[in-house]
Regions:
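RNA pseudouridine synthases
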Residues: 1-317
Length: 317
């Protein structure tokens, strides 16, 4: 991996740009004006004048730097103002190698799109003054619970290997209907769902397709309970808490696997039906929680378990 010559600033990495090998642009600045001059020409000139755009080894570029002098350049993006999300991260464990936190619903794991400062990673880098912090896995923005991050670049690889080799056991909880939706067969629990999932970057939803299974989840029904209005005795008012053990880590895997049984997770705006985009409703978080994570710590060689202190808002009993 190519090392950025610019440090993390305000918890955010510098952006890397590859310059074209050739083209009608004389200088690196000409090329950047071609790409982004319609948005903020003054800002681009100011950055070159201030020496804020650098090449490999941290060499500063100026307005006259030739296009062919550099293959890669780095700079800090102008960050749009963000509204702080009304959710908090709980720190559960911190040592010289790892940080374990409870990520709240609605907060993305890593910066992207409209969420930069408002991501678990950037918030924690700034809060703890840990510019080298990197998450070892991801949770969907709408999912809450246990998130493991590496605080130490020297030992990071040893934890990464555990995730790559699937030597980390993860346990989730969700709240769904107690019985499958109309048209779906009854389910004998525990059940293992196996299928082939795919997710294209251009499309919001993950899809199940024919072929060799690449996604597997063991699902257990923990307990059923009455939901909502106690005077409403229709079957739909019965819900259940489920324990999920994913053996693979596909995007949206747990949400898709529950929906495939006719047991879509409560407050899921994507599965089984994609709802119209709406502002976040903080009173209705997706009822999916990363409850626990277990592995043999590569440093101490001891089996460790970290468990979430959060509870799903719709779980009863």
């Amino acid at each position: 991996v190519m090392q950025s010559p610019l440090p993390v600033r305000d918890g955010v990495n510098a952006t890397r740009l590859r310059l074209p090998d050739e083209g009608p642009w004389d200088t690196a600045m000409d090329y950047m004006m071609h790409r982004w001059g319609h948005i903020d020409p003054q800002g681009i000139e100011d950055r070159f004048d201030a020496g804020e755009i650098v090449g490999e080894g941290g060499v500063r570029l100026n307005r006259g730097t030739k296009l062919e002098d550099h293959t890669f350049i780095w700079y800090y993006r102008t960050l749009p103002p963000e509204t702080r999300l009304p959710v908090e991260i709980n720190i559960l464990h911190q040592d010289e190698h790892i940080l374990v936190v409870d990520k709240p619903h609605f907060l993305p794991t890593t910066p992207g799109g409209t969420y930069i400062q408002e991501s678990a990673l950037v918030r924690l880098r700034n809060l703890l003054n840990l510019p080298d912090l990197i998450p070892m896995h991801r949770l969907d923005r709408m999912t809450a619970g246990i998130l493991l991050l590496s605080t130490n670049p020297d030992t990071r690889g040893r934890y990464q290997v555990l995730f790559e080799k699937r030597q980390v056991q993860k346990e989730y909880e969700c709240v769904s209907a107690a019985t499958p939706a109309a048209g779906y067969p009854a389910v004998e629990f525990p059940v293992v769902v196996r299928n082939r999932m795919t997710k294209s970057r251009s499309y919001l939803l993950a899809e199940v397709i024919d072929g060799e299974p690449n996604a597997e989840t063991r699902i257990e029904r923990v307990r059923a309970f009455d939901a909502g209005d106690p005077t409403d005795h229709t079957a739909t008012s019965r819900r259940a808490l489920y324990r999920l053990e994913p053996h693979t880590g596909k995007t949206h895997q747990l949400r898709v696997h529950m929906a495939s049984l006719g047991l879509g997770i409560v407050n899921d705006a994507f599965y089984p039906d994609l709802l119209d985009k709406a502002p976040d409703d903080y009173t209705k978080p997706l009822q999916l929680l990363a409850r626990g994570i277990t592995f043999v710590d590569p440093i101490t060689k001891e089996r460790v378990e970290y468990r979430s202190q959060l509870e799903l808002s719709e779980a009863r009993g």
